[in-house]
Amino acid sequence: MQQRIKDILHQGQVGDRITVKGWVRTKRELKECTFVNLNDGSTLAGLQVVIPNTVAAATPTMKDLTTGAAAEFTGELVRSPGKNQAIELHAEEIHLWGTADPETYPLQKKRHSFEFLRTIAHLRPRTNTLGAVMRVRNACATAIHQFFQERGFLWVHTPIITASDCEGAGELFTVTTLDLTQPPKTPEGKIDFSQDFFGRRAYLTVSGQLEAEIMATAFTNVYTFGPTFRAENSNTSRHLAEFWMVEPEMAFCDLRGDMELAEAFLQFVFRYVLDHCPEDMAFFQERIDHSVMATAEQMATQPFAHLSYSEAIQVLEKSGRAFEFPVAWGLDLQSEHERYLAEEYCQRPVIVYDYPAAIKAFYMRLNDDGKTVAAMDILAPKIGEIIGGSQREERFDVLQERIVTQGLDPAPYWWYLDLRRYGSVPHAGFGLGFERLVQFMTGMDNIRDVIPFPRTPGNAEF
């Protein structure tokens, strides 16, 4: 296996003879030698390769060694006289794998706007910013699995194609093989999905939660981590049509246990990234948002504040702020309300709990007051809601009534109700939008810049 530049920079010794492969970021030709900055994606920093004129003269492809070209260098590591890194490679042999015409290659040595980079999404991973984003994204995913695996959770794979709408919002992508120009019709004139591939209407999943509840009733503690889909026609910096969700589900757990786990989970992930991606986080601190390190440190170390929804409404009403959206008991909190609570009132992450039943999903447990449900949201400075969760309704009759009162057809949820017929227990869970986490971690303004291939209204390249 070839040596990666990250390992060479951290473990390479003066005098080592190595071969390294990567892509040319920059090339500078001087009187006695040529300097090439080579990057292979393993680290933000590139390896400086020094090519003596004698070696350059013996390399016919030297003129094609331009920004974007893929190349292989063999030589000896020597102490670098420069300040930026301790060692550099003095090349003795050069092999050019692939050229990049400088007249047409769009990534040159200058800053490109993120808007421009979205138009060349197949090349933007080669930039410093997107490279750093992807390494932080990888570290977040690694931390998520480590957190749950260390606590005995079972990773379960919930279906991408589903027959149920977890959120009841109706923002679903339909999956069909019917001829849309001449679909079969029912006697009432509606599309007859009984003749479709699955014999019924099917959708891309909006959440793995309901299926995770099935698994939690057998394995106690489980989690899902996979793609979800929302057909929400929102062209904003916070919305994607395809995104990843982390959704743990715990049997024999109430809302308090759910909140405690969610707080510990976020603290673990932020600490892991700070410890494992210091160079990338320093890059975001310098280039993107001067407060990302302090924010991440706060998330990793400070205990979260707690407010009931009713208390939060009182705080907002007494704030003296002229919010764009109205504040009243029974209305959902908007992003401006969430950010005020986290950034100004609590000045740290805050968990808001016990929301009005009317504004929350049917599966959330009805509290004894009959007006609120055992739901919680974790609100973070600068971004607002980062986690949403609840204790689930384990009582058959109450759940059945909630489905009906929210205007849903009980028929597709027969199996969900069955879980309450046989060995029902209190259980709880939460959901984390993975891209929202990465966006918060890195300070990136637009969520489309923290996922490799963003899916948004009017855009599904590749």
Swiss-Prot record:
GO terms for biological process: asparaginyl-tRNA aminoacylation. PANTHER family: ASPARAGINE--TRNA LIGASE, MITOCHONDRIAL-RELATED (PTHR22594:SF34), ASPARTYL/LYSYL-TRNA SYNTHETASE (PTHR22594). It comes from the Bacteria. Disulfide bonds: none annotated. This is Asparagine--tRNA ligase. The gene is asnS. PROSITE patterns: AA_TRNA_LIGASE_II. It catalyses: tRNA(Asn) + L-asparagine + ATP = L-asparaginyl-tRNA(Asn) + AMP + diphosphate + H(+).
